[in-house]
Amino acid sequence: MLTPKKWLLGVLVVSGMLGAQKTNAVPRPKLVVGLVVDQMRWDYLYRYYSKYGEGGFKRMLNTGYSLNNVHIDYVPTVTAIGHTSIFTGSVPSIHGIAGNDWYDKELGKSVYCTSDETVQPVGTTSNSVGQHSPRNLWSTTVTDQLGLATNFTSKVVGVSLKDRASILPAGHNPTGAFWFDDTTGKFITSTYYTKELPKWVNDFNNKNVPAQLVANGWNTLLPINQYTESSEDNVEWEGLLGSKKTPTFPYTDLAKDYEAKKGLIRTTPFGNTLTLQMADAAIDGNQMGVDDITDFLTVNLASTDYVGHNFGPNSIEVEDTYLRLDRDLADFFNNLDKKVGKGNYLVFLSADHGAAHSVGFMQAHKMPTGFFVEDMKKEMNAKLKQKFGADNIIAAAMNYQVYFDRKVLADSKLELDDVRDYVMTELKKEPSVLYVLSTDEIWESSIPEPIKSRVINGYNWKRSGDIQIISKDGYLSAYSKKGTTHSVWNSYDSHIPLLFMGWGIKQGESNQPYHMTDIAPTVSSLLKIQFPSGAVGKPITEVIGR
């Protein structure tokens, strides 16, 4: 018979066991938020510092930990690889994402990084927009590892205007990944994740937030004469936006232009506002950060990239985009304070790559610059035809790499080495070229570090080209005659911000050298979970406190 004394003893024992379990639980934040500001050069933190408010970038700098000397440790420095490397702690040679696109030597065609014809679009009828998944990714992400550590009870969501910047950070088995459809102005996904859009996504889409954001056009946040960190408003090296005939403020017809082409919102600061509002909706819709099981939200802020590409780093448009993003971040952090609680969430902010100054801007200030070969594939194929008598020997030229068509070589009875040597010799004559490397012989190449290591890390034997080209400093692809671009090893493309704030983070900064690939191991160490499967980086001891 169970006496009152024995019953009370049993209750005390069970209560003690439950208390011990709670006490011994691994200390983790309720929510991790990984923010990637697309194309954010490290110096943007300080170029516009005097105009930032206290709640956005300055909050991270003044209450969090800033790493001032973080570089990307591979080439090419592009969006898909950047997001993959941040969240895998790995490099293209291992994780398999060798570019936004690459040439598939077996299929004989260009392949987009997240393209997947085995899945169907959800939320749109456009296959090109919706047929995407992480199947081309060979390694696990830190978000995957969190799922493995919690027996997949953690909620993981990726949000971006860009498909690749939502899909790759969220990993192989997230709760969801959502991206923007230019044809409808709504967020969508694919059947890789779900058969139908969750109610919270439909509710958000039905609010028609993009139209509301562009309704009043785009004018400068501050009086335009205060944008002293930027060039004058009307310069020849800036691109146009919408129906405006000059690259100048104000952009009064934005609402009309958006209705004609909904993807236009990408090239305005309001694309970032939209993304962060969608991120807020994801937190609410998935009840993220409400219990002791850590959740993970990945957010790519893509409009900084689109605005940067179109106008260039020294434009008033870019400065205004960052000042508005600063305010959006302050609102987002305030919402996290209310929903999750100060000290209960961990945020890190970085970038997938930087950007070069516009060629026109550099020329105006007597800096070394120029354009890379206008149409290298066409020009070189003409020379190869004359030399070897075969057409289309070069199958593709992308990511500063040259791919040879193996079938053409075989049919023409040509040796790869002979053709490659000839092309390398010809490329070395180009004034824009610094080095030309055979990807079969990178280890033996007599080029300095860190270029050599970055080429090795970026080379994927299955997906990269036969020749790697290193351009001279300041030389941009010919398609970037307006605005700017990125892809190279130089500091303007490879030097990125890295800030941590919130749970478990002390205030401070470090000038010690670190790499993009150190981010995922650092987050893994803070969460006390296994590193991603292909990680080559190491935890940043200043951040984790030991």
Curated annotation (Swiss-Prot):
Query: Predominant location of this chain?
Result: periplasm
Supply the Pfam families for this chain. Answer: Phosphodiest
Q: How does activity depend on pH?
A: Optimum pH is 8.5 with 4-nitrophenyl phosphate as substrate. Has 50% residual activity at pH 7.5 and 30% at pH 9.0, being virtually inactive at pH 10 and at pH 5 or lower.
* Region forming the signal peptide: 1-25
Cofactor binding, per record: Binds 2 Zn(2+) ions.
TM region positions: none
Q: Which reaction does it catalyse?
A: a phosphate monoester + H2O = an alcohol + phosphate
Cite the InterPro entries for this sequence.
Alkaline_phosphatase_core_sf, Alkaline_phosphatase_prok, Phosphodiest/P_Trfase
The UniProt note on temperature reads: Heat-labile. Incubation for 10 minutes at 50 or 60 degrees Celsius causes 40% and 60% inactivation, respectively. Heating at 100 degrees Celsius for 2 minutes causes total loss of activity. Heat-inactivated enzyme cannot be renaturated.
Where along this sequence does the record place binding of Zn(2+) 1? D38, T79, D352, H353
Q: Where in the cell is it found?
A: Periplasm
Q: Which GO terms describe its molecular function?
A: alkaline phosphatase activity; carbohydrate phosphatase activity; glucose-1-phosphatase activity; glucose-6-phosphatase activity; metal ion binding; sugar-phosphatase activity; zinc ion binding
Chain sites annotated for binding substrate: N100, K162, D163, R164
Induction of the gene:
Expression is not repressed by inorganic phosphate.
Its EC number(s): 3.1.3.1
Instruction: Identify the residues that bind Zn(2+) 2.
Output: D305, H309, H486
Name the chain's protein. Alkaline phosphatase PafA
Species this protein is from:
Elizabethkingia meningoseptica (Chryseobacterium meningosepticum)
